[in-house]
Amino acid sequence: MNTSLISTKSDSTSVHSRPTQEELAAKTATFLQKGLEGAANTRKAYRADIAGLESWLQENGMGVLPIGPAPLAAYLSDLAGHQKWATISRKLAAIRKWHRLRKHPDPGHDEAVRLVMEGIKRSIGTEPQQAPAFEIDSYKQSVRAIPPTPTGLRDRAMLLVCFAGAFRRSELVALDIESVQFTRQGAVLSYRGSKTNQHGHTEQKALFFSPDPETCPVRALQDYLSLLSRTTGPLFIRIRKGEQITDERLSDKQVARVTKQYLGEDYSAHSHRASFVTIAKLNGADDSQIMQQTKHRTRAMIDRYTRVQEVVKHNAAMKLGL
């Protein structure tokens, strides 16, 4: 036997201290909790949903959490009078998860609750309200009118990056300065975590120089960054009265407010994303190119965004001669 092939040294790299049963149980419980809780934005929405339920229970004298199927069915029925299907479904998911996390019986598993939800679905429908898309000419006109103040430079950059990058507002405000890399063609923005990427994988979006310097997302971003006396930290930040620049990260609600301020009350922050898909599609971009920027996992959402525009653009009713 060739004993030289046999190592006489202990392999310290393959040996690790074994956790105790208590440590392993605690670790397992931690991972289970994280798996149940879901993404940060989902947890935030769920907390608000539970707070709303607690207020409703108190106002209607129906006790406190945890609840059973009967009060849950009553709550869902009440919501059906003023909420959309998607909102009701999310609230139900939050309530069910709250009970599961605390090892209470899941009231949403009850047959009566499921039948109530089926009745609500049939009554109010499930079609989500689509964020309106804007016309590119009116959008560019609105952006050009933004004054070159510190707040204006921030808002111009924020709107153009949101549109050209097809960002969700939560993704936009989560960007850091160090996540921006300028290139000869424009810029690459890196970020981690999104609605369709809940495991924190790094994703990237590209911005390109535009012929018009007033509506170029890359130049707008460069102009805004020249205001900030730092190279790390939040990209889009609060600016106080008197144009005092802070290092406080902007909230996603501010993206919605700024959108309405410059584009009009009919538009939401999500209109940038909807408009990106609609305008790119009508200008000849294929679905794979669009999905490269939006990070949609399926073409179903692309079809939803462009449905109304396609009805108008490709329709024989224009050729009736009336």
Residue ranges: model-predicted function:
Residues 1-322:
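Extended, non-catalytic subsegments within catalytic or DNA/protein-binding/adaptor domains
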